Amino acid sequence: MDKYTELVINKIPELGFVNLLSHIYQTVGLCSSIDISKFKTNCNGYVVERFDKSETAGKVSCVPISILMELVERGMLSKPDNSKSQLEVKTDLVNELISKNNGFEDIMTIPTSIPMKYFFKPVLKEKVSKAIDFSVMDIKGDDVSRMGIRYGENDKVVKIKIAPERDAWMTNTSIHQFLIPMCYGTEVIYIGQFNFNFMNRHAIYEKSSVFNKNTEVFKLKDRIRDNRSSRFIMFGFCYLHHWKCAIYDKNRDFICFYDSGGNNPNEFNHYRNFFFYSNSDGLNRNSYLSSLANENADIDILFNFFIDNYGVTAGCINVEVNQLLESECGMFTCLFMAVCCLNPPKGFKGIRKIYTYFKFLADKKVTMLKSILFNVGKMEFTIKEVDGEGMQQYKKMEKWCANTINILANKITSRVEDIIN
């Protein structure tokens, strides 16, 4: 809650102001980022950029011309006219492919060297939850705000019922369909989502034994074994009906956990090689007197599992709360793993940058990203611009940043020139 106190009491627009800080941190190399401009259409721009180096990349269709030429070589499409430009050839091939098949899903069943669906944003089957800017929420961030409006808090607040929206909960399928293409061709492999809710009803001292005997653990071991060639192994897991995730670096014997709900270091067992990342204090170990709470048993068990089975020598987890509402933990973990695909955490410096990215992320921005990173409309094989509510809100936020940057630049330049001159 600390990170929202000043924003809420002073009614600073959280989305614009925090987004501006995020840009500053990214520019000076203090945090990781994800380029939203690569999702302005129905394409996954990162995948297109990774595999399509032609002049037609991201034009006509998300699918590269090289993939379409595979279909020509197999006799599924007509040979192109060599006198035409690449763009004209691609247009002809796309139109022919559409005419010969019964819609988008039919085209996606055609086998190619890289699955064609990887170049498109996956369809969003879930609802986008209702969230608002925290600066207009009635959050009692300190003693003054708890004393009432007349003691300083602006009365411009919006009452919102904080309750889970089950229709907005991310399914394993949606997370899988987004992350598999994001990882494809990188040194990171996503091995799926794991359900550890079977431990929920057991006492803390029983959980480790129950965990090691469950078939879900054998599935985890099998998938790690099947992906020996990848440096980073990444997966999500659910415990007490809350989603978290982890990324394991095989080269450095290092595992990083992420929990959008935040963590209290005093509610974990103490290990000399397990660290807690706080935005204000950095990476630190907890007290020797700390004891494990039930809600953190999954992290404790997984850390020991990786020590015993894979020789992990260090681990870490975030401290700060990133998520206040109760519906989007799946989206938070999905986004964390996506950032890990783009910026794999090679040691503590790398994971610090990823955790810091989430310092500037809250429920409202996540809901915007949910409707931008996924396709909320009908799937089309041709390029379509995204103009939904999420993108409109995101553009509005970025315009606020652009205007504010110009104002700041002018004011700061004026002050500096007064000093220099």
UniProtKB/Swiss-Prot annotation:
GO terms for molecular function: cysteine-type peptidase activity. Late protein responsible for processing most or all of the viral core and membrane proteins known to undergo morphogenesis-associated proteolysis. These proteolytic events are involved in the transformation of immature virions (IV) into mature virions (MV). Induction: Expressed in the late phase of the viral replicative cycle. Its EC number is 3.4.22.-. It comes from Fowlpox virus (strain NVSL) (FPV). One of its GO terms (cellular component) is virion component. Pfam families: Peptidase_C57. This is Core protease I7 homolog. The keyword Flavoprotein does not apply. GO terms for biological process: proteolysis. It is found in: Virion. Keywords: Hydrolase, Late protein, Protease, Thiol protease, Virion. It is an enzyme of class 3 (hydrolase). Belongs to the peptidase C57 family. The active site is at residues 242, 249, 329.
